[in-house]
UniProtKB/Swiss-Prot annotation:
GO cellular-component term (any): tRNA methyltransferase complex
E.C. designation(s): 2.1.1.33
Protein function: Catalyzes the formation of N(7)-methylguanine at position 46 (m7G46) in tRNA.
Annotated binding of substrate, by residue: K133, D165
Species in which this protein is naturally found: Chlamydia felis (strain Fe/C-56)
Protein name as annotated: tRNA (guanine-N(7)-)-methyltransferase
Family annotation (PROSITE patterns): SAM_MT_TRMB
Catalytic residues as annotated in Swiss-Prot or TrEMBL: D129
Binding site for S-adenosyl-L-methionine: E54, E79, D106, D129
An annotated Gene Ontology molecular function: tRNA (guanine(46)-N7)-methyltransferase activity
Reaction catalysed by this enzyme: guanosine(46) in tRNA + S-adenosyl-L-methionine = N(7)-methylguanosine(46) in tRNA + S-adenosyl-L-homocysteine
Amino acid sequence: MKPQDLKVPFFWEERSTKIKDNVLYVPEHYFKHHQFIMPSWEEFFGNDNPISCELCSGNGDWVVAQAKETPEVNWIAVEKRFDRVRKIWSKMHNCRVTNLRIVCGDAQTFFLHYLGEAVVQRIIVNFPDPWPKSRHRKHRLFQDEFLNNVVRVLTEPGILILATDDKNYLLQAIQIMRQYLSPTMEDPYYCEVENYGNSWFETLWRSKGREIFYTEFVKKLGYS
């Protein structure tokens, strides 16, 4: 399968939520999410295996490799850009990975409208856009709304992982995660990590001599 074999299942003017070819399409600038009847994840995957969800999946190298190595886990790859979704989809088919589903859409919208309570065991955020300029900070993923949704969709105990090359972003994310979750590491709550997995961004940043930072938090039992 080639990336261009995946076609958008609607015209922009007629956009709506759809599932096709193991891709859930969550359109932007759309206000009828509540009208879509989302099948259970057991139906979508065909089993009730535990679910891990990667956000910012990029070209899909990392998540496809993880899904192939852990067939006992169901994987969800969330990526906003359709050109990247095509690449994930192509790799998924060419690697004959059957335990991966793709979400083409915004992570916040997906969490809010399409994930129920306590359905995901692990959420992995790989190299999110740090939006370094002060006037752009409102676009950062790690904010109260996102963490509220994370706590809602995670099982108990559930894990939230962040990998980034941007230390300032890491420290800001840790500060807000500590308000909702418990760190699994001792202060300063992060470490450098080797052999985290093969992703396009990790390869890029390591080739430029950057350090890769990793942090992990767990959902507090009884938090709601």
